[in-house]
Amino acid sequence: MDSTGEFCWICHQPEGPLKRFCGCKGSCAVSHQDCLRGWLETSRRQTCALCGTPYSMKWKTKPLREWTWGEEEVLAAMEACLPLVLIPLAVLMIVMGTWLLVNHNGFLSPRMQVVLVVIVLLAMIVFSASASYVMVEGPGCLDTCTAKNSTVTVNSIDEAIATQQPTKTDLGLARETLSTRFRRGKCRSCCRLGCVRLCCV
């Protein structure tokens, strides 16, 4: 698709293979695959900003040893890990305190019993707060950590169509609806669901 007058809308360079990734026309119609990949990794968009066409792409998180840790990622990791450390400690304190109160009640002074009850109650509060924080804020912290540490594979429109094209070339069969194909039993033998997947066309 490298014709005269076309240039990448991201880097404005005409060199290299230019491909279409969305429904845009004119000067924003084509771009380099690497340029668009970098733009998507930075912007975290899933659709074209101009025409709204969803990109054919797949996100993959890098292995942990390849992660880059900026200040934002370190803070998010600390926010996510601190409650995960506090939860087992709180459970341990609750179990030990309850065990001491139940099994050794006769050996403990009244003041020590009050101290153990307070410790158990505080451990329950810490456990509840930490568990709530992990459930509410945990996904956001994980997203912050993985945002800069994931790569995207984006397909051009031609590549996306090629991977989803029907294997039969007969126009009559290609125009059939999925329900018609299901009723006629034209599904491939490899399909265990018995119908509506594109691989069974």
Curated annotation (Swiss-Prot):
Gene Ontology biological process terms, A to Z: protein ubiquitination; symbiont-mediated suppression of host antigen processing and presentation of peptide antigen via MHC class I
EC number(s) recorded for this UniProt protein: 2.3.2.36
Recorded topology in the membrane: Multi-pass membrane protein
Pfam families xrefs: RINGv
Transmembrane spans: 82-102, 114-134
All ranges on the Extracellular side of the membrane: 103-113
Chief location of this protein within or outside the cell: host cell
GO cellular component annotations of the record: host cell endoplasmic reticulum membrane; membrane
Keyword line: Early protein, Host endoplasmic reticulum, Host membrane, Host-virus interaction, Inhibition of host adaptive immune response by virus, Inhibition of host MHC class I molecule presentation by virus, Membrane, Metal-binding, Transferase, Transmembrane, Transmembrane helix, Ubl conjugation pathway, Viral immunoevasion, Zinc, Zinc-finger
Domain of life of the source: Viruses
Cleaved signal peptide residues: none
UniProt: Zn(2+) 2 binding residues: C22, C24, C48, C51
Annotated metabolic or biological route of this protein: Protein modification; protein ubiquitination
Region entry DIRT, spans: 52-79
Location in or out of the cell: Host endoplasmic reticulum membrane
Zinc finger feature spans (RING-CH-type): 1-58
Substrates-to-products reaction catalysed: [E2 ubiquitin-conjugating enzyme]-S-ubiquitinyl-L-cysteine + [acceptor protein]-L-cysteine = [E2 ubiquitin-conjugating enzyme]-L-cysteine + [acceptor protein]-S-ubiquitinyl-L-cysteine
One example GO MF annotation: transferase activity
EC supergroup of this enzyme: transferase
Spans within the Cytoplasmic topological domain: 1-81, 135-201
Phenotype for W9R: Abolishes E3 ligase activity
Comment, domains: The DIRT (domain in between the RING-CH-type and the first transmembrane) region is essential to determine substrate residues that can be ubiquitinated.
UniProt miscellaneous comment: Murine herpesvirus 76 (MHV76) is identical to murine herpesvirus 68 except for a large deletion at the genome left end of the unique region.
Function: E3 ubiquitin-protein ligase that mediates ubiquitination of host surface class I (MHC-I) H-2D(b)/H2-D1 and H-2K(b)/H2-K1 molecules before they exit the endoplasmic reticulum, leading to their degradation by the endoplasmic reticulum-associated degradation (ERAD) system, thus blocking the immune detection of virus-infected cells. Mediates ubiquitination of lysine, as well as serine and threonine residues present in the cytoplasmic tail of surface class I molecules. Promotes ubiquitination of hydroxylated serine or threonine residues via ester bonds instead of the classical isopeptide linkage.
Record note on quaternary structure: Interacts with host UBE2J2.
Protein known as: E3 ubiquitin-protein ligase MIR1
